[in-house]
Amino acid sequence: MKRISLFILALVLIVSGMNAQQVVWQPDVIIKLTPEWKGERYPDGRPKVPDELLERLKNCAFEEVQGYLGMHGYRNVFENFASLYENGWHIIHPERVMTGRALTAQFMPMRPDFNDYVQAQAKEEGTHTPVTNYAPIIKLQEGDIYVADSYGKMEGGTLIGSNLGNAIANASKRGVIYNGSLRDYEGLEAIGENFNGWIRGYDPSGIQQMMTAWVNAPIRIGRITILPGDAILAKKNLGTSAKDAPL
């Protein structure tokens, strides 16, 4: 009986402590998360890496970027997924190089009680629409790359199709990096120069039994921990996340 009482008490403490967990991380938290950045920021708190730096980053080899960041203590900045999955990345337009600023999202398997909390907490934070796979897209700015961890889910894990892909292209003029899948591949491929994607694969199914856990928070993509606002360099079969590097 004593063990059961302690277990129930632990659950009560966990649930009561959930009020502190943000859904959309707020600007003051992101600023505290990225204190090394001394330059301009977006209103949401993310570092706004200059466009000039992002253009220069396109011409950098991964060895240069990884070497420089490694000297400054940042060693987990490179991922090609080949170490985890046989097929590595699938790239919609492999001939293109993509750089941009990370806007992050974490997806999880649907759990109704947690999703209820997410919806209620987001409303308290000022979000006026349901928190779905569209929630990160409406926050995109030009130059952003939408980076999401959807835990590698393929069937039923398709975060976007061509409609949302067009919305991303119009807003960010960049594209996506997903540890997961998408649908309507041919429609996404036809969007044009303002969209590209690094994904695990694609599937004709619609998104099912998934929930958005948080937006603009730290996420993991393979071997990389990505923070909101990180500068991203994505090339053929490869991806890297860079800090404030004077390249």
Regions found by a protein language model. Name each.
Residues Q21-M71:
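N-terminal pre-domain segments of enzymes
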Residues S5-S16:
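Bacterial N-terminal signal peptides
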Residues A231-I232, N237-T240:
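Channel- or pocket-lining gating/hinge segments that regulate access to a cavity or pore
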Residues F62-E64, N76-P228, S241-L247:
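Feature captures the catalytic cores and cofactor-binding loops of soluble hydro-lyases/lyases
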Residues G45, I168, D230-I232:
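Buried hydrophobic positions in well-ordered alpha/beta secondary-structure cores of metabolic enzymes
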